[in-house]
């Protein structure tokens, strides 16, 4: 009897850029060397929840793009507790094909469907080339192609492979308002021990702070005084009390790097809540190990770092 396939959830249907990222992760061995079963999801939340609920062993989701910045639905999906973590990342060059049902010309296009993030990357092309066409929001770029196949949109901006999958004709290829635009994707699994540091790693956490003057400055200063670079910080509403926020932080370095560990210990002491989202190899050279010889000796914060790196419950 053969082993069951490894289930990987992703933003579907087939023909999305997320599916292309899934293939890159698979080629890199992120999901192991066994058979892979793809599980299309309707949203990043649904994909990540598939891992939380044990329906999938992994999920692949977009987290940041060159044109429109952070993919906030992914941040919200990760901010649901500490039982999933990011283990790898990949970047894709993003350019779209404009696809239609066979026999349709650009002059016939009155509606174009694509994901809202995709629309931000083709809207100038639309304004110039098909100025009278209306944009229709789709749950993914692949779903936009499906809408064309089903007759609910005249055209879609999607990866070229989607045309083959849905029996469409590509009228224009390599459409992108910003040349060289890229999107970063991450692979997510259930909480477990982190991989060993590589010297070029990225760590991500989510935290909330007391709503008092200076709390965020004091928290971020813990990283500055230890020479730890912050590559991204985003705020998202807590959805509990109006005007209160949780912060998503990307850090250059690994949780087992001493400067990063020190800074996270100090942040743990200040935060109302601190969620570990993962430490993983970065594909960017600037995410290098910080250099410092400072040591922290606070037992409670030490225990938090050990628990995070060993895959145990975080207190």
Curated annotation (Swiss-Prot):
The keyword Lyase applies. GO terms for biological process: L-phenylalanine biosynthetic process. GO terms for molecular function: prephenate dehydratase activity. Its EC number is 4.2.1.51. The record marks 183 as: Essential for activity. Pathway: Amino-acid biosynthesis; L-phenylalanine biosynthesis; phenylpyruvate from prephenate: step 1/1. Keywords: Amino-acid biosynthesis, Aromatic amino acid biosynthesis, Lyase, Phenylalanine biosynthesis. GO terms for cellular component: cytoplasm. It catalyses: prephenate + H(+) = 3-phenylpyruvate + CO2 + H2O. It comes from the Bacteria. The keyword Lyase applies. Residues 204-283 form the ACT domain. Pfam families: ACT, PDT. Residues 7-190 form the Prephenate dehydratase domain. PANTHER family: PREPHENATE DEHYDRATASE P PROTEIN, PREPHENATE DEHYDRATASE-RELATED. This is Prephenate dehydratase. The lineage of its organism: Bacteria, Bacillati, Actinomycetota, Actinomycetes, Mycobacteriales.
């Amino acid at each position: 009897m053969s082993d069951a396939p490894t289930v990987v959830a992703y933003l579907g249907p087939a023909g999305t850029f997320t599916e292309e990222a899934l293939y890159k992760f698979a080629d890199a061995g992120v999901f192991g060397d066994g058979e892979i079963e793809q599980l299309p999801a309707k949203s990043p939340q649904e994909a990540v929840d598939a891992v939380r609920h044990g329906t999938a062993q992994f999920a692949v989701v977009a987290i940041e793009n060159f044109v429109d910045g952070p993919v906030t639905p992914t941040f919200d999906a990760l901010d649901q507790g500490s039982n999933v973590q990011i283990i790898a990342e990949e970047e894709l060059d993003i350019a779209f094909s404009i696809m239609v049902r066979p026999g349709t010309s650009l002059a016939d296009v009155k509606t174009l469907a694509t994901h809202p993030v995709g629309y931000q990357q083709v809207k100038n092309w639309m304004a110039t080339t098909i100025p009278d066409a209306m944009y229709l929001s789709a749950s993914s770029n692949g779903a936009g192609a499906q809408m064309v196949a089903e007759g609910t949109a005249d055209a879609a901006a999607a990866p070229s492979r989607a045309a083959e999958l849905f029996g469409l004709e590509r009228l224009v290829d390599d459409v992108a308002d910003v040349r060289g635009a890229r999107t970063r994707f991450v692979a997510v699994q259930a909480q477990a021990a982190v991989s060993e540091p590589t010297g070029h790693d990225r760590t991500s956490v989510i935290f909330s702070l007391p709503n008092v003057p200076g709390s965020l400055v004091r928290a971020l200063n813990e990283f500055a005084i230890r020479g730890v670079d912050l590559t991204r910080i985003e705020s998202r509403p807590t959805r509990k009390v109006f005007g209160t926020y949780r912060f998503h932080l990307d850090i250059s370095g690994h949780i087992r790097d001493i400067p990063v560990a020190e800074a996270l210990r100090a942040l743990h002491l200040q935060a109302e809540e601190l969620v570990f989202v993962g430490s993983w190899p970065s594909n960017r050279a600037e995410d290098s190990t910080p250099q410092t010889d400072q040591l922290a000796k606070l037992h409670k914060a030490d225990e938090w770092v050990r628990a995070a790196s060993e895959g145990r419950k975080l207190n």
